[in-house]
Amino acid sequence: DGEWISFASELEKAGADALELNAFILPMDEFAESVEVENMYFDIVKHVKKVVKIPVIVKISHYFTNLPAFVSKLKAYGADAVTIFNRFYEPDIDIERIAVGAASVFSMPADLRTTLRWTGILSGKDKLLQLSSSTGVHNGEAVVKLLLAGATTVQVCSAMYEQGIGTIRTMNHFLNSWMDKKGFESIDEFRGRLSYADAGNAARYERAQFMKYFSDHK
């Protein structure tokens, strides 16, 4: 935890308004219980919060046994907000060179689905949760979807690398045009309207199997 604390303190002194901890611990120890892995995250948050006064956001992956419970505990340990999900280096295999290399570091639009599901569930279960949604956001439509699901804010990274910084202007234009078309004057008027709690059909978020889809598929 020492480096987390040191860097957090230095960043606050440098003038940061808030701090996002991009935390990912690869759980590879077959003898470690899941609670031991989760406690590593809680310890980081607890110790960082002791040395800074600015808001602390924790950026997490979806590799947890029970995400709602884990996020609830992060808040209990002092996290002011949570970002879902971080994207990290992943390996790939080159079958021509017969070697392990790196996969693409950029997200794809299809990655939005996991983020969308958990944005809806987490925001629906805790309406006071400050939730930033990330990964798979490549256009304005994705921004609108995440806000409808309950995101407090939306993060964009891969799209800017691939399309340039102007993509932010394009996304904002789409959002404003969509709001005008639907008659909304502020984001708060529709934020979370389709969350797990407010969608009127929570089963859509809970459903994970394809049986009904394929039985209806022509």
List each model region and its residues.
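Acidic-and-aromatic substrate-binding clefts and catalytic sites of carbohydrate-active enzymes
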Residues: 1-3, 162-163
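Alpha/beta enzyme core
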Residues: 2-132, 138-154, 200-202, 206-217
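C-terminal helical cap(s) of enzyme catalytic domains, especially alpha/beta-barrels
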Residues: 93-108, 161-184
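A generic structural signal for well-ordered alpha-helical surface patches
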Residues: 120, 144, 148, 165-176, ...
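Short Gly/Pro-enriched loop/turn and capping motifs at secondary-structure junctions
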Residues: 137-139, 160-161
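Charged C-terminal helix
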Residues: 177-217
